[in-house]
Amino acid sequence: MSNPAKPDDSVGPQTQLGWLNGYRSAVSLTFDDGMDCHLDPVIPILEDHNLRGTFYPVAKGNWSETETSLPYLERFRPAVENGHEIGNHSIHHWCSCAARLDLESSDVSNHTPAGLEYRTLAELETELDQACQRFEAIFPEITLWSFCYPCYNTFVGRGTSRYSYVPLVAGRFFAARGGGEMSNLTNSPYHADLHCLMSWKCENRKADDLIELIQRTNRDGGGWNIFTFHGVGGGHLSIEQAEFEALCHYLQREKDTVWMAPLVEVALQLHQWRQQGN
């Protein structure tokens, strides 16, 4: 999943609003894990409000290079055809196991635990390459891909053997979304790492809370808020459907002030603005 024109993170001093073409801020709504609720009710709600989202399903299931079928991904084809973004969320969805109080069973042949603490960069490299093969086989028309770090984790190993796998992602994808450890997770057009973008977790949040984040960014001018959803109206890490609908209603109402677009589209515009020497 190569991208010959990869983002350059260097920018110079100029008004932040320049990259937004007159909007006060940008917003991307992202949805992790390819849940059933993303197909219904999320996509119909988005389309009822003339909004487009970014969906990160996992390329799980049996597959070989001679096959071009993977039902878990193919069910998102109508979303792609309607202008939504589909991004890569890996195959095995490896996460940190640091909080587990039992011995996690292995899912690899060397019988080590499955958490990122026990993975290597070589294993992540293979995981990313194989995931790229699967996504590209199912959606060959997509030329610009983004990646979503499972569980927001961007590392492998522990202690002196702990390494970031962000560089591996940067070599394969145009942009990538993580989480963030700061109190303010709005992405700056000057400083944001397009291969480790920060995002706001939305589980158990109220629409008013998320709207206030957008309004605060509008007052400051020029930032990019990325919201991460899992369950909507049910499922794990869920937000109530009514709260999600209220957020979508706000974004539709503020369409002349807030640029709401899929993650890879916002990343591309920011990249192009930076390439102009801004």
Q: Model-derived features: where do they sit?
A:
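Active-site beta->alpha N-cap acidic-glycine motif
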Residues: 3-102, 117, 127-154, 216, ...
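Catalytic domains of cell-wall/extracellular-matrix polysaccharide-remodeling enzymes
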Residues: 41, 63-71, 95-103, 110-205, ...
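Surface beta-strand/loop "capping" patches
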Residues: 271-278
